[in-house]
């Protein structure tokens, strides 16, 4: 049985046509959260057989396989350490939105991560936006002041 819930209801199967979802995990003890995405299926190219290789140019086929979404608990190392230490029962696993293309899932994830300022807010486990790592990015008072100036300018 999956630990995911959508609008309070348990999710055991993906909605028809959905590519993936954006989720929020919440630590029920300290209320820290994590916003991420998960695809329902993985896709890879099927290796060509020797016969196909020797035949010359052959179009490769793609294989779709269900991902580990039912058991998935996020990709943040700090989050996963907390889940191991505190127990999965101390976290809620909530699907926020479904996307019906890869682009929709990615857009939803990054949009929500920016909207909730997950990199600068200590209430979030996130250390990246989308798949981009901000390795050299440190949140300083100067950076926050610059962001406030831009925010004020844009209204």
Which residues fall in each region the model found?
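Structure-specific nucleic-acid interaction/processing domains
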Residues: 1-155
């Amino acid at each position: 049985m999956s630990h995911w819930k959508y609008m309070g209801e348990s999710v055991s199967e993906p909605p028809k046509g959905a590519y993936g979802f954006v989720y929020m995990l919440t630590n029920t003890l300290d209320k820290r959260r994590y916003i991420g995405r998960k695809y329902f299926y993985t896709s890879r190219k099927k290796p060509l057989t020797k016969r196909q290789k020797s035949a010359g140019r052959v179009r490769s086929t793609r294989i779709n396989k269900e991902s580990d979404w039912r058991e998935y608990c996020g990709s943040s190392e700090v989050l996963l350490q907390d889940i191991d230490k505190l127990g999965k029962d101390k976290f809620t696993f909530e699907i926020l939105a479904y996307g019906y293309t890869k682009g929709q899932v990615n857009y939803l994830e990054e949009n929500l991560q920016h909207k909730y300022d997950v990199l600068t807010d200590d209430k979030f486990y996130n250390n990246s936006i989308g798949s981009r790592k901000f390795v050299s990015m440190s949140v300083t008072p100067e950076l926050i002041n610059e962001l406030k100036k831009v925010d004020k300018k844009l209204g």
